[in-house]
Amino acid sequence: MVTSPLRAFPADGYTVRWQRWHHDGDETLNLRWENEGWTATGEVGHEAVTYVIRLSATWQVRQFLLFRDLDEPDLWLGTDGSGRWGELNGAHRPDIDGCVDIHLGCTPFTTTLPIRRLKLEEGDSVALTVAHIDVETLGVTPVDHVYVRTANRRWRHIDESGATTDFDVDEYGLVRDVPERFRRH
């Protein structure tokens, strides 16, 4: 079955908000087009963090910045687009080489990255190794995730422990609700 394509984001940007499932925090995400790519800025209230993800026009991660309690980023990672990662100071991060996407557990937005980038058809799946970022410790580790497009706007995510989550996306590929975790508002 041919799947309908995702809608292009408005050129002047897009804002979406999620709330924690049990109303104990929220997130505001702003997407804007600049310098021939997308910049996603998320403010996650329940974690007291702000993240910035700079993406290519084809939704490949180029840079990731995480701010907690400083004006300067607590963590700043960059990739060459071929799976080689490093830090702002130029230090190579071979421990996460090969990862194309990143995963932050405090936001549903990072789930959108492979959805937008891969353009899977209904019934297709892909196994990816992603760079998982722990916002408390600033640890970055490679973890395996599987994404399955089960219907036009329905997906299944299987994490490294085998836990399965089904969720719906909107016309842009942004997660609507993740049961027991996040809901759009």
Please state what every model-predicted region is.
Residues 2-26, 74-155:
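Solvent-exposed helix/loop surface patches that form functional interfaces
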Residues 8-53:
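N-terminal ordered "arm"
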Residues 25-29, 49-53, 72-76, 163-166, ...:
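A structural detector for short beta-strand units
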Residues 33-38, 54-61, 79-82, 150-153, ...:
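Short, solvent-exposed coil/turn segments at beta-strand boundaries
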Residues 44-46, 157-161:
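Short loop/turn motifs at secondary-structure junctions and domain boundaries
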Residues 44-89:
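Hydrophobic/aromatic-rich structural module bridging two neighboring secondary-structure elements via a short loop
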Residues 159-185:
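C-terminal structured interaction module
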